[in-house]
UniProtKB/Swiss-Prot annotation:
Residues 3-233 form the Glutamine amidotransferase type-1 domain. It comes from Gluconobacter oxydans (strain 621H) (Gluconobacter suboxydans). Part of the FGAM synthase complex composed of 1 PurL, 1 PurQ and 2 PurS subunits. It comes from the Bacteria. The active site is at C86 (nucleophile), H206, E208. This is Phosphoribosylformylglycinamidine synthase subunit PurQ. The lineage of its organism: Bacteria, Pseudomonadati, Pseudomonadota, Alphaproteobacteria, Acetobacterales. Coiled coil: none annotated. Part of the phosphoribosylformylglycinamidine synthase complex involved in the purines biosynthetic pathway. Catalyzes the ATP-dependent conversion of formylglycinamide ribonucleotide (FGAR) and glutamine to yield formylglycinamidine ribonucleotide (FGAM) and glutamate. The FGAM synthase complex is composed of three subunits. PurQ produces an ammonia molecule by converting glutamine to glutamate. PurL transfers the ammonia molecule to FGAR to form FGAM in an ATP-dependent manner.
Length: 233
C-alpha cells in the first residue's frame, strides 16, 4: 500500500502514524511537506495530529489553505482515500472534505486521556476491521474536539450511515451529556465520520497510538489492517 503523511508546521504525530502504518504494511510511508504541490502516485493520504500553524485563527484553518491541500482535494475528488486524525480531522472539515466543525471542548480546556469508541459503521475501509457495535480504547489529546453540524447535516450523516465512531463507556453505552463517556461534548457523541463515498474519514482520537503491544495495546490495529485489506487485498 502506497501511503503518504502530510506534515505541516506544528504537526507532532507524524512519527506515530509512520510507526502504525509500517507495522501493518511492512514499509514506511512517505512524508510530504505542506509546501509541496503534488502527492504523486498514492493509495492513501494521511493528515496527522498536532497543532498545525499553532492553531491560529481556528484549528486546521491555515493548514487547509496549504499548497499541498489542492492536490489532496483533487485526490479525494477522484475517489482517493484520505484519513485525518485529530488536527487532520479539523483540516478535513476546514477544507470541506468532511461536513461540520470541531469546536472548543465543552469544558473549555485541553483534554489528554483515554476514551472508548463504539464502531457504528463496519463497512468502510477504515472500519471493516471491526464488527458494528465493537468497543475499543484510544487516546485523545485536543482542545477543539467538540464535533457539531447543522441539524440537516446530522440527519444526513445518521441516515446515510456515515457516523463511523461514537464516544461511549467501556460497556458501549452512549450518553451525550455524560463527560465521562463523551469527554469533549460532541453532538450525538460523534467521534468520527465518513464522506459520502466512504473514502474520506476523520476522527479525533488517536488509534495510531495503540498499535504496538510493547507500548500499551493494539486496539487501533484493526483500522490499519482494514485499510490494507481494502486498498491492497
Amino acid at each position: 500500500m502506497k501511503a503518504a503523511i502530510v506534515v505541516f508546521p506544528g504537526t507532532n504525530r507524524e512519527r506515530d502514524m509512520v510507526h502504525a502504518l509500517k507495522l501493518v504494511t511492512g514499509q514506511a510511508p512517505r512524508l510530504i511537506w505542506h509546501g509541496e504541490t503534488s502527492l504523486g502516485d498514492l493509495d492513501l493520504v494521511v493528515l496527522p495530529g498536532g497543532f498545525s500553524f499553532g492553531d491560529y485563527l481556528r484549528s486546521g484553518a491555515v493548514a487547509a489553505h496549504s499548497p499541498i491541500m489542492r492536490d489532496v482535494k483533487a485526490f479525494a475528488g477522484k475517489g482517493g482515500h484520505v484519513l485525518g486524525v485529530c488536527n487532520g480531522f479539523q483540516i478535513l472539515t476546514e477544507s470541506h472534505l468532511l461536513p461540520g466543525a470541531l469546536l472548543r471542548n465543552a469544558g473549555l480546556r485541553f483534554l489528554s486521556q483515554d476514551c472508548h469508541l463504539k464502531v457504528e459503521n463496519a463497512s468502510s475501509p477504515y472500519t471493516q476491521g471491526w464488527t458494528r457495535g465493537d468497543v475499543f480504547r484510544a487516546p485523545l489529546a485536543h482542545g477543539d474536539g467538540n464535533y457539531t453540524a447543522s441539524p440537516e447535516t446530522l440527519k444526513r450523516l445518521e441516515g446515510e450511515g456515515r457516523v463511523a465512531f461514537r464516544y461511549c463507556g467501556a460497556d458501549g453505552a452512549v450518553s451525550d451529556d455524560d463527560r465521562t463517556t463523551n469527554p469533549n461534548g460532541s453532538t450525538r457523541s460523534i467521534a468520527g465520520i465518513l464522506s459520502e463515498n466512504g473514502r474520506v474519514c476523520g476522527l479525533m482520537p488517536h488509534p495510531e497510538n495503540l498499535t504496538d503491544p510493547e507500548i500499551g495495546a493494539t486496539d487501533g490495529v484493526p483500522l490499519f489492517k482494514g485499510l490494507v485489506e481494502a486498498l491492497v487485498g
